[in-house]
Amino acid sequence: MTVILDPRGPRSACRAAGPAAAKLKGDHSTGQQMFANIAPDTTITAIEPLRSDPTMRRVRVGRKTIATVQAADVEAMGLAVGLDWTDQLAQRVQRAVETHQARGAALGLLNRRAYSCGELIDRLARRGHSSQVAVSIAQELATAGLIDDEAYGRAIARETVATKPASQEFLARKLRERRIPDDLAQRIACETLADVDLVEAATQYARKRLHAMPTVSRTTATRRIAAALARRGFDADTIAATLGRLNQAPLTDQPAT
């Protein structure tokens, strides 16, 4: 599935990133132990381009290759041969390595299907990336237009009501399950159903369900239809109105109650 892009640009900018980060369990850095055996008084001895990828640099400290980072990160961090390898520098390089790995993982996920910011943060966290890096990458990709919570949410909303009717609350709940922020989920649900006659939509659905139960008594069929509508989030008044319309046109092939 291709990534959903909106020509107007990203709409959410990962507004759910803050709350999502708070819900993540722990801070599992993929590179936590990568510098454990490097003496703090060692210096950078080489920074070499990779033959397989000229945009990447291999960083050596002492006799050990310590990390492979992007050339842009080398410049941004001011890495140079002879620079002292300090704990602070090690942490910065570790963060750059993990950020690069997380970005690659995120792009791989987005190549398969679209995600909301919250979903992507959760997936990166489950793969072991720290919450801080996961949020940072999601925000970066949202700014670039590769994640768009509003476009993604609208696509889900259209798909949800394409074959079965749904109430506004049901639709908003489905969007929240896909980690769409609550205020955006409510707005999308409201706008999706703005021109929909919910009683008429529910009645058409009920008639299809009734036709699919030719050997079931009318009483049992009505009970099942009412339960199905309740599961789709319809309130008691809408269900009653739907069943009233249904009973106005009884089917002759239904068994007697």
Say what each PLM segment does.
Residues 1-257:
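An alpha-helical, amphipathic repeat domain used for nucleic-acid recognition
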